[in-house]
């Protein structure tokens, strides 16, 4: 049986992951539960983990997985599980099993070739997007409407959003985005970077998901949106 605070935290984590695909930060959890310190959140997370409601994913910053909610047994949660490659998808990265590719009439897997357009900085911006280096064959279930491309991540500025160095991000081509979206931003037509977009009055803020990096503020004429994050592929 969970305490009131344990139940509140579990619901908050579960709802946030359904909305954004990313677990809330300790500060967000602390504020949501009206606690004075993050140590209280740490104790609640340990208690939920010991009771089998969540698990912390090793060697990843801010990585939690909800295993079950109250009323669902651990056996129910684990029944029928099998190993499948993990794919993080959604506009802010939602962890889901990679969907199985559909077969065509000849029994071959119907895949979509997505161009990999070089590397993108999740850190200090690097030179503008490079030309196509190779392609990835992905099942159509992974793709939303529109044209897509992929980029290889270099840097650690987005680790709190679950995006790590050497990950491959799937980007939908578009030149607009909502505040809070993770986007490929082209700065002064020279530097490309992967950051969270925030609008601050007439200015645009490119926000890292790592406290070691400062938010950068630009005039609207200096930043062009090159696409929005819709998926992430990680190789183990």
Curated annotation (Swiss-Prot):
It catalyses: Hydrolysis of Ala-|-Gly bond in repressor LexA. The record marks 122-123 as: Cleavage. Coiled coil: none annotated. The active site is at 157 (for autocatalytic cleavage activity), 195 (for autocatalytic cleavage activity). It comes from the Bacteria. Its EC number is 3.4.21.88. Residues 26-46 bind DNA. Keywords: Autocatalytic cleavage, DNA damage, DNA repair, DNA replication, DNA-binding, Hydrolase, Repressor, SOS response, Transcription, Transcription regulation. It is an enzyme of class 3 (hydrolase). The keyword Hydrolase applies. Pfam families: LexA_DNA_bind (PF01726), Peptidase_S24 (PF00717). GO terms for biological process: DNA repair; DNA replication; negative regulation of DNA-templated transcription; proteolysis; SOS response. InterPro entries: LexA, LexA-like, LexA/Signal_pep-like_sf, LexA_DNA-bd_dom, LexA_repressor, Peptidase_S24_LexA, Peptidase_S24_S26A/B/C, WH-like_DNA-bd_sf. GO terms for molecular function: DNA binding; serine-type endopeptidase activity. The keyword Protein biosynthesis does not apply. Homodimer. Belongs to the peptidase S24 family. Represses a number of genes involved in the response to DNA damage (SOS response), including recA and lexA. In the presence of single-stranded DNA, RecA interacts with LexA causing an autocatalytic cleavage which disrupts the DNA-binding part of LexA, leading to derepression of the SOS regulon and eventually DNA repair. This is LexA repressor.
């Amino acid at each position: 049986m969970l305490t009131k605070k344990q139940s509140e935290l579990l619901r908050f984590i579960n709802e946030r992951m359904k909305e954004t695909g990313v677990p809330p930060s300790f500060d967000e959890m602390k504020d949501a539960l009206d606690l004075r310190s993050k140590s209280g959140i740490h104790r609640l997370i340990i208690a939920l983990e010991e009771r089998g409601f969540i698990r912390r994913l090793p060697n990843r910053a801010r990585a939690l997985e909800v295993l079950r909610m109250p009323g669902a047994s651990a056996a129910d949660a684990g029944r029928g599980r099998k190993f499948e490659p993990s794919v993080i998808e959604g506009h802010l990265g939602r962890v889901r099993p990679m969907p199985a590719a559909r077969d065509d009439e000849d029994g071959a897997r119907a895949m979509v070739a997505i161009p990999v357009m070089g590397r993108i900085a999740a850190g200090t911006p690097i030179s503008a997007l490079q030309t196509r280096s190779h392609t990835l064959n992905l099942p159509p279930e992974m793709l939303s409407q529109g044209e897509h491309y992929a980029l290889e991540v270099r840097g650690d500025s987005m680790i709190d959003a679950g995006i790590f160095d050497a990950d491959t991000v799937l980007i939908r081509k578009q030149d607009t985005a909502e505040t809070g979206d993770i986007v490929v931003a082209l700065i002064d037509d020279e530097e490309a970077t992967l950051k969270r977009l925030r609008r601050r009055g007439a200015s645009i803020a490119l926000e890292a998901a790592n406290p070691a990096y400062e938010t950068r503020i630009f005039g609207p004429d200096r930043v062009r949106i090159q696409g929005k994050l819709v998926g992430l592929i990680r190789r183990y």
